[in-house]
Amino acid sequence: MDSPRLSRRSGVVAGAIIALLFVVAMVPGFREIGADVVGVVDASYVRSALRLTVPIAFAGMGGIFAEKSGVINIGLEGLLIIAAFTAIAVMWALGGRDAEGMLVAFFAAVVASAFVAFLFAAVCIEYKADQIIAGLAVWLIALGIAPFGSIIIWETVNSPSVGTLDTIPIPVLSELPYVGPALFDVSAPVYLLFVAVPFSWYLLNRTAFGKHLQASGEDPKTLDTVGVDVRKIRYTGVLLSGVYCGIGGAGLALNTGQFVGGGETMIDGRGWIGITTYLIGNYNPIGAAVASFFFAGLDALQLELQRIAGIEISSTLVGIIPYVAVLVVLTFVGRTRMPDAAGEHYDPDE
């Protein structure tokens, strides 16, 4: 890694520390937390952070595949919303408790998200729509249709509670002190995340498809010249973003056991944070996953701080911790190089 890039990535750590120090210094009551806060960071906290990492990291990795292909998909938030709503709606329709129903609900959510991503791809690739506007449309449509669907089905924007995913302990490993319950006694979407991160890196960097995908976003004309269909590559990249968001949205919803449609819905900006993670990670799935865990960890921390008895801190103030950290870290990271042809339409006849 060259010196400027190393310096920029080191700024991420510095930014995180400064953000936390700022909160500690500015918020009355934080200085008195002391040992209570230290006690929060246990195996249960790590499991909670990993659960919250799932939608952010999968959205971030999905965004990498789309943008590397040359299509900027800022509709990740909308895809997560569609997936979360579909998962709970199908789970509720099937009775809401058994493992088979959860599996069906999970796949239904992935299919729904991938279908919306396909429509987005068609609008952008075939009809050459502005990708930013189309992505915003996906988000706004999802933000309206999911709560509306909730009202139609349940007569309220929030669904009734359904079953939640059980943790799956791995024999022997789950019994290790601290690390065992934190990493090896988690739910299926978290295990999927552990597999998806190295798989995504390998797919992007060590396969012919990955090379074609990156060429599609850097120099589609050259890729077309050697006989590779740029349209198909871009469709595949966007569809992968839909599949990944489907996994992330379904994972969050089925871990929660309810769809919350009020306000920004239960997704609550995680798709937007997913975009920042791959910018921070410079379009590297591993970097995006690490950034996702950092922000999810802050999210989990603010939830724990609100729960601790005796700490009188505004829940609204504590809730902005992850978003303040996003701004600080992005400031320290600086410019990230986008694919040269990202956002540009390609017509082989031109």
Features from the language model and the residues they span:
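Single transmembrane alpha-helix segments in multi-pass membrane proteins
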Residues: A43-F106, V110-V111, V116-I132, L279-N284
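Helix-loop-helix "hairpin" substructures at the membrane interface of multi-pass membrane proteins
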Residues: D185-V260
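Short loop segments and helix-boundary regions at transmembrane helix junctions
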Residues: D2-S7, E67-I72, V116-L173, M266-G269, ...
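Transmembrane helix-bundle core of multi-pass membrane transporters
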Residues: L143-L203, A309, I313-S314
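Membrane-interfacial amphipathic/re-entrant helices at transmembrane-helix boundaries
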Residues: M1-F58, I72, T86, D98-E100
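Cytosolic-side transmembrane-helix boundaries in multi-pass membrane proteins
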Residues: M1-V27, T225-K232, L305-E350
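Transmembrane alpha-helical segments in multi-pass inner-membrane proteins
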Residues: F259-Y323
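Hydrophobic core segments of alpha-helical transmembrane domains in multi-pass membrane transport
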Residues: V12-M26, A59-G60, A84-A87, G144, ...
